[in-house]
Amino acid sequence: GYQKVTDPAARAKFAKAWGVPEENLPLEEGYKLTDLGHLVDEGKVHCFYNYGEDPVQTEPDSAGMRKTLSELDLFICQDIFMTQTTMLADVILPATSWGEHEGVFTASDRSFQHFDAAVPPKGECRHDWEIFADLSTRMGYPMHYDNTEQIWNECISLCPNFVGATYEKMAPEGGYAQWPVKSTDVNDHGTPDMFAGGKFTTKDGRANLMA
């Protein structure tokens, strides 16, 4: 929701919502995928949980990524296909595809749209949120959700730019919400044009262009 982990107000809000001490939330930004190689080499990372990505195929240094993943003590993959990355995993958690679950996606124009499942899950695959909730509960932080709408409502309650992106707006055919959308009024579908009037969110209000 575009809120910095270093923002005291944001940290306090999330800690209260999640029922955890504020000091339990990290004060620094997390690692990036491109940091993984040297972090494993330096012994700072021993386990990696890969979700819905195929970095062996998508990262520029495929051989380097393969070497990094092979040197982990524990490598977990959560995906819908047997990819070049999942072939290296110690544990594979089979997830549902988009046609087997419902939820919300974000388009490149900032539009949130709801989609329904077309068919029930096959075999042993489970919804992503069910896997995460079950794993979290087993690790000591109970997550008791019944459906994706409950999770979505938690998300928008914590993110000011998304607060008006309700299922009520998105569920009807053709329904959508385009963030920032700060009103729950069913007729308010958000902001079609960002930075109207030429005002940007930089310190001087002007666009910063880089060549």
Specify the residue positions occupied by each region the protein language model found.
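Long, low-complexity segments enriched in small/aliphatic residues
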Residues: 1, 13-21, 152-211
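Non-catalytic alpha/beta scaffold blocks inside enzyme catalytic domains
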Residues: 1-162
